[in-house]
Every structure is written in C-alpha cells, then in structure tokens.
C-alpha cells in the first residue's frame, strides 16, 4: 500500500498544481469521478489487456466519464495510460483531496450514525464538530444500526465515538476489570 502511495504522490502533486491554477473544485469533482471509473474491474481488465492500444484505452476511459474533460485532463489520462498507471487513479485522488484539504484548512469527516440524520441535524452536528476539531469539515455520512444510538466521527486519525455501543463497551471493560 505504501508503494502505491509513493508512486501516486508525484502524479497527485502535479495534478494539484494544474488544478490550483484553474478551478480547484471542478478539478476535485473530476478527479473523484476518474477514480470511481478507474476502480471499476472492467476498466482494470481493459487497462491491463496487452491487445488493446493505449489510444483505445484512453478514449474508452474518457468516454466513460460524465463530466466534461478538458485538454489538461486528457493529457493526464493519456500519460497515465502510457505509463501503465491508470489503475493508480483511486490513490492519486486520495492524495489530491488531501492536498486540497490542506490548502483549504479543511478535513474529511466520516460520520457514522445509528439513524438517518435530517439536513438540519447534520448541519448542526457539522457546525459543532468544526468547533471541536478547529477546521472546516467535509462530511460523509453513513448509517450503521449496530451503533444503537449516537454517532461515531473519524477526522484524519482522530476518532470521536459517542455511540451507545461504545458506552456499553466502556461499561463492560470497567465491570470486568
């Protein structure tokens, strides 16, 4: 895994420099979409098929994208295909978004809730979490009924677990100690 990160880093940094000079948010959306397409097993098989030309791989990949693809993005995709690095796009996207978050002073927040959150609840929760963590958060919300109640929040390497399940586990540890 560390090897993939090492290989992907220069690509992510170069792409980030290009995106900074243009519209960073539209590039971030395009990079996310490219990563999703590249993660598809059919794309992996196509990219590693020696009978398929680089031009065909590039054009097929570009046609699979819903977002408009500019000249810089086409050049980037062509370069990845020529260097057999197209399947690195998910890791490149991860590093690209980390660079974007660092520039914006933001962080990705993975919020796991026991129940579906309304938009008002989510807005209030994110505002509270932004105060606690001291930076802007980009939330991703999932629902896990196993939490019983409450939420579990992961921001970078920090975890805030206020779920009922976590409280029960703490009580179990305290009672068995």
Swiss-Prot record:
Any idea which GO molecular function terms this record carries? proton-transporting ATP synthase activity, rotational mechanism
The compartments listed are: Cell inner membrane
* Keywords attached to this entry: ATP synthesis, Cell inner membrane, Cell membrane, CF(1), Hydrogen ion transport, Ion transport, Membrane, Transport
GO terms for cellular component: plasma membrane; proton-transporting ATP synthase complex
Do the record's keywords include Transport? yes
Q: How does it sit in the membrane?
A: Peripheral membrane protein
In the UniProt record, the gene name given for this protein reads: atpH
Function per UniProt? F(1)F(0) ATP synthase produces ATP from ADP in the presence of a proton or sodium gradient. F-type ATPases consist of two structural domains, F(1) containing the extramembraneous catalytic core and F(0) containing the membrane proton channel, linked together by a central stalk and a peripheral stalk. During catalysis, ATP synthesis in the catalytic domain of F(1) is coupled via a rotary mechanism of the central stalk subunits to proton translocation. This protein is part of the stalk that links CF(0) to CF(1). It either transmits conformational changes from CF(0) to CF(1) or is implicated in proton conduction.
Q: How does it assemble?
A: F-type ATPases have 2 components, F(1) - the catalytic core - and F(0) - the membrane proton channel. F(1) has five subunits: alpha(3), beta(3), gamma(1), delta(1), epsilon(1). F(0) has three main subunits: a(1), b(2) and c(10-14). The alpha and beta chains form an alternating ring which encloses part of the gamma chain. F(1) is attached to F(0) by a central stalk formed by the gamma and epsilon chains, while a peripheral stalk is formed by the delta and b chains.
Protein family: Belongs to the ATPase delta chain family.
HAMAP family, A to Z: ATP_synth_delta_bact
* Protein name stated in the entry: ATP synthase subunit delta
Q: Which Pfam families match?
A: OSCP
């Amino acid at each position: 895994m560390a090897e993939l990160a090492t290989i992907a880093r220069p690509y992510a940094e170069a792409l980030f420099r290009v995106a900074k000079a243009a519209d960073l948010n539209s590039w971030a959306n395009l990079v996310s979409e490219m990563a999703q397409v590249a993660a598809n097993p059919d794309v992996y098989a196509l990219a590693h098929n020696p009978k398929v030309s680089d031009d065909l791989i590039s054009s097929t990949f570009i046609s699979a994208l819903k977002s408009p693809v500019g000249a810089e993005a086409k050049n980037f995709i062509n370069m990845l295909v020529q260097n057999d690095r197209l399947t690195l796009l998910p890791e490149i996207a991860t590093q690209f978004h980390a660079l974007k978050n660092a520039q914006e002073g933001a962080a990705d927040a993975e919020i796991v809730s026991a129940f579906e959150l309304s938009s008002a609840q989510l807005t209030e929760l994110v505002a509270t979490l932004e105060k606690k963590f001291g930076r802007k958060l980009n939330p991703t919300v999932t629902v896990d009924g196993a939490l019983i109640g409450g939420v579990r929040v992961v921001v970078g390497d920090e975890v805030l677990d206020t779920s009922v399940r976590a409280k029960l586990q703490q009580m179990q540890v305290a009672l068995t100690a």
